[in-house]
């Protein structure tokens, strides 16, 4: 079971977006990276196609999972993730507050 999943609210721990929060759009486990909305924005020069115009577009670039932490459901601060078995199912738990992480 992954600690960070699509749809999770995360906090950036290091880099140019340190301290900012966003929602995980996509997780790439093989590369140990994730796409987070509004985080690690880069500009790409887009060549013209039949459907798109040419120009400079801004989009999210992947960020390494080690630079992300789950936001605690209670106070929004970064927390580590633990696991617990409840009703025969393995669930994620915030180490900071003990709250269950939805997902």
UniProtKB/Swiss-Prot annotation:
Protein name from the UniProt record: Large ribosomal subunit protein uL24
InterPro entries: KOW (IPR005824), Rib_uL2_dom2 (IPR014722), Ribosomal_uL24 (IPR003256), Ribosomal_uL24_CS (IPR005825), Ribosomal_uL24_KOW (IPR041988), Translation_prot_SH3-like_sf (IPR008991)
Function: One of two assembly initiator proteins, it binds directly to the 5'-end of the 23S rRNA, where it nucleates assembly of the 50S subunit.
GO molecular function annotation: rRNA binding; structural constituent of ribosome
UniProt xrefs under NCBIfam families: rplX_bact
Similarity-based family: Belongs to the universal ribosomal protein uL24 family.
Name of a matching Pfam family: KOW
Subunit structure: Part of the 50S ribosomal subunit.
Organism for this UniProt entry: Brucella canis (strain ATCC 23365 / NCTC 10854 / RM-666)
CDD domains: KOW_RPL26 (cd06089)
One GO term of the biological process aspect: translation
Gene3D superfamilies: 2.30.30.30
Keywords (A to Z) from UniProt: Ribonucleoprotein, Ribosomal protein, RNA-binding, rRNA-binding
Gene Ontology CC, one term: ribonucleoprotein complex
């Amino acid at each position: 079971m992954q600690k960070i999943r699509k749809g999770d609210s995360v906090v950036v721990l290091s880099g140019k977006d340190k301290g900012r929060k966003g929602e995980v759009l996509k997780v790439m486990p093989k590369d140990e990276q994730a796409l987070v909305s509004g985080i690690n924005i880069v500009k790409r020069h887009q060549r013209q196609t039949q459907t798109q115009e040419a120009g400079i577009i801004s989009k999210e670039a992947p960020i390494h999972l080690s630079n992300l932490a789950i936001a605690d459901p209670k106070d929004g601060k970064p927390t580590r993730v633990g696991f617990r078995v409840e009703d025969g199912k393995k669930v994620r738990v915030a180490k900071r507050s003990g709250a269950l992480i939805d997902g």
